[in-house]
Every structure is written in C-alpha cells, then in structure tokens.
Regions:
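C-terminal motif of bacterial Sec signal peptides marking the signal peptidase cleavage site
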Residues: 15-19
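Positively charged n-region of N-terminal signal peptides that target proteins for export
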Residues: 1-9
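Exported/periplasmic ABC-transporter solute-binding proteins
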Residues: 4, 20-291
Length: 291
C-alpha cells in the first residue's frame, strides 16, 4: 500500500513538473492575464489631459463631461507613485509624463508611434499636452524675473535638456541678481522640469529663494488664485473658471503622456482605441490585446 502511494506521488510530481515546463518549451513570453488599471487622482492635470485625448471623457445626454475611468482603477496621487505601482505589478498599466520616463517601466507605442519627442513634434504620437505656468494678474518682480528666465533661450534649453519640447525660442536672459522669494505650486508632472529651472536660475541669481510645492494642477491653480503661491503649475489647459478668476497662463513646454506597463509585460504596442477600452473597463484581460 505504501509502495502504491509512493508511485502515485511520484507520478503526480512528474505530471506537475511537465505542466510547469510546458510553457517554457513554447519559447514565447506569457501575457500576465487580468489587467490592473492605474490612474491619477481627480484634479490631476495629467489625468484631465489623458482622459480627453484618449476618449475616456465623454458627454452625457445633458452635455456634461463624464470621466469614464474604470471604477476598478487603482488611484495614485503622483507620477512617482504611478511608476512605482506599475514597476511592482506585472499586470499593471498606467500613464505618466513622458519627461518622467526612465528604465524602470516600459512605454507603449500608440497607433504605431513610439512616445518620443520627435514623434510628438511631428504629430505621429497623439497623446500630448501643454505645461502651463499661471499667475494671478501681474506677477511680483521676483516671480516675473523667474518667468522671464523660464521663457528665455537659456530656460527653454533647460526644458529641452530635460526631455520636453520647448514652447518658444526666447531671447537671451540677463541675471538680475534678485533676492526675492518665489512660491511655486501645482502639478507633479511639471515639478521635475521646474526643479531643473530652479537650479539653473539660482546658479545665475544665488540670492534668489525659489520654493516649489508639488501637488496637482487643480491645487496649483487654486493656490495661485488664493494667493498661496506666486506661480501655479498645470499639466493641462486652464479651465474657464480659472481664467475667469484672473489667472494669466503661459505655455512653458509641450509634453507627451506615456502609457506605461511593467518591463516584463510582452505587450509593446496598443491602439488608442485599445487604451480607451482598457481604461474604461471594457477590456480586462491582457490576452485580449493583439499586436
């Protein structure tokens, strides 16, 4: 009897090993099955731009805009959290500022176009949006000088070096030696390039005090309206209500929105229609995504 049990166990183990090895013999990577959608929070400029550009935002019968992001989506409150979530989950898909991309995650080609600066400039990659800086009326002398640097040839060179698309060919900036404080707040997508601009600006004006507070686009615009900050950052176009409140925007740069997956996910490309279907919860399995 013991001998018979032993034989059964050996056969069971052998069959299990054969089943495990069967996938390796195909030589192909296996898709990770169920899709885990990762989205930014409401108020995020990246989310606002993404749902508009990907067709996730629609109008209802009354003409009101409706965000159809899946209720099953995992909500993240910053670019870095989205990246960390996707990096740690083979089934995940999310979206981030192209300028924040690194080798920890993989950006998908959309409609046959890779997410690159050149493809955004040519229009081949369609998921792109502006970075705005906004002040309430006339900026303070210190804030105005910082903005002058950001839009200058030197400032726009920093924008390009940081992986974004410059907004304009500005003139030469001459250091003012300003010692004033400038409070900047808003989008987590705009923050990285603003940190680079701050570093370059302070290098030219060592006595300047530039403070940057990361949150989201809506918070940044509200902070500028309420006088909590001198300059608000938004990774989307300003809303009518924000313009009516007196905000005066300027386009700092253009940026793509990269649709990202885990590096171990074999999927490398999707159509924009597939992206929409995934993020509204119609497509829920990676095996439904054909390449």
């Amino acid at each position: 009897m013991k001998k018979m049990i032993g034989i059964v166990l050996v056969l069971t183990l052998a069959l299990g090993l054969a089943a495990c090895g069967g996938g390796d013999e195909t030589g192909g990577e296996q898709k990770p099955s169920m899709i885990s959608v990762v989205s930014r929070e409401e108020g995020s400029g990246t989310r606002g731009a993404f749902i508009e550009l990907a067709g996730i935002e629609e109008k209802d019968a009354a003409g009101n805009k409706v965000d159809r992001t899946s209720e099953m989506a995992e909500i993240s409150n910053s670019t870095s959290v989205v990246m960390a979530t996707v990096m740690g989950n083979k089934r995940a898909i999310g979206y981030i500022s192209l300028g924040s991309m690194n080798d920890d995650v993989k950006a998908l080609a959309i409609d046959g176009a890779d997410a690159t600066v050149d493809n955004i400039k040519s229009g081949a990659y369609s998921i792109a949006r502006p970075f705005h800086l906004a002040t309430l009326g006339a900026a303070s002398p210190a804030a105005a000088d910082f903005l002058a640097f950001a839009m200058s040839a030197q400032g726009q060179a920093v924008v390009e070096e940081s992986g974004y698309i410059s907004a304009a060919a500005g003139g030469d900036y001459k250091p003012s030696g300003t010692a004033g404080q400038v409070r900047i707040a808003g989008s987590s997508s705009v923050t990285p390039v603003m940190e680079k601009l701050k570093e370059a600006y302070v290098g030219l004006n060592p006595s300047a005090d530039i403070q940057i507070q990361q949150s989201d686009s809506t918070t940044g615009m509200t902070s500028a309206i309420e006088g909590i900050c001198d300059i608000g950052m938004a990774s989307r176009n300003l809303k009518d209500s924000e313009l009516e409140a007196g905000l005066e925007p300027v386009v700092l740069a253009m940026d793509g929105i990269a649709v990202i997956v885990n590096r171990e996910n074999p999927v490398s490309a999707m159509t924009l229609d597939q992206v929409r279907s995934v993020f509204i919860g119609e497509t829920t399995d990676w095996n439904e995504i054909g390449e």
